């Protein structure tokens, strides 16, 4: 049956197999500081090619790219914008490994959402599942981030942000007006001992949904949280 039709939900599915892959890529970086940038650009693109002549149990192609730009807006402030996306396609009659599918959300993608909580939904906000009952991630995804960063005192900075993104299955069309979105604030402190910033993030889900399972009952106990606090390093 197609994903999501009469399949009882389950948290995990077991996969046993070997992936043999190569991942050539390209990276460009002109940022003024690799850990705490305020101007410059960064671009990276890579394609993972698995299976086929490389062997293994899974055969797929997975290109992913991201571009980020930083602009000075004042002596103590800057603006940053980031866009990233990717897709995955299987070949040789193989299926896409469930652990290679895209699920976004969290401090590295769409803040204000719990990690991995954004995934494909149908028109009635039902999630999709495999025949084994595992939640399906997307065949493709897109993430957009914009933030204004202002130095407060010493290593402490205030960040105001807007994030948006979503993941879709292959048969679903991309709709820029149906991205999951959040806004909020972040305190960011760079400490040399970590070589990365400490991040205290408060994000607001701009349109909480009640995501449903195959039988129409709410997943995860009901509606999504309207806000979320996150801590991260890096």
Where are these regions (language model features)?
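Conserved short loop/turn motifs at secondary-structure junctions
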Residues: 50-51, 204-206
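C-terminal outer-membrane beta-barrel translocator/porin domains of Gram-negative envelope proteins
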Residues: 1-152, 160-164, 168-177, 211-224, ...
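Short Gly/Pro-enriched loop/turn and capping motifs at secondary-structure junctions
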Residues: 165-167, 192-194, 205-209
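Conserved active-site loop/cleft motifs that coordinate metal ions or position small ligands
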Residues: 158-161, 196-203
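Strand-loop-strand
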Residues: 170, 175-185, 189-195
């Amino acid at each position: 049956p197609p994903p999501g039709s009469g399949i009882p939900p389950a948290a995990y599915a077991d996969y046993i197999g070997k992936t043999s892959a190569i991942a050539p890529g390209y990276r460009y970086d002109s940022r003024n500081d690799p850990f705490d940038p305020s101007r410059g650009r960064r671009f990276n693109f890579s394609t993972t090619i698995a299976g086929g002549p490389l062997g293994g149990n899974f055969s797929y192609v997975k290109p992913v790219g991201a571009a980020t730009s930083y602009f000075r807006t004042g002596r103590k402030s800057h603006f940053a914008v980031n866009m990233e996306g990717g897709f995955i396609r299987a070949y040789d009659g193989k299926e896409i490994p469930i652990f290679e599918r895209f699920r976004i959300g969290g401090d590295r993608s769409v803040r204000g959402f719990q990690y991995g909580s954004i995934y494909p939904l149908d028109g009635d906000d039902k999630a999709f599942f495999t025949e084994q009952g595992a939640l399906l991630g997307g065949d493709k995804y897109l993430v957009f981030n914009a933030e204004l960063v202002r130095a407060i005192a010493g290593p402490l900075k205030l960040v105001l942000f807007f994030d948006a993104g979503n993941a879709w299955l292959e048969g679903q069309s991309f709709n820029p007006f149906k991205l999951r979105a959040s806004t909020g604030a972040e305190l960011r402190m760079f400490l040399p001992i970590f070589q990365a910033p400490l991040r205290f993030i408060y994000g607001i889900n701009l349109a909480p949904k009640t995501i449903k399972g195959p039988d129409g009952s709410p997943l995860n106990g009901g509606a999504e949280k309207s806000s979320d606090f996150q801590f991260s390093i890096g």
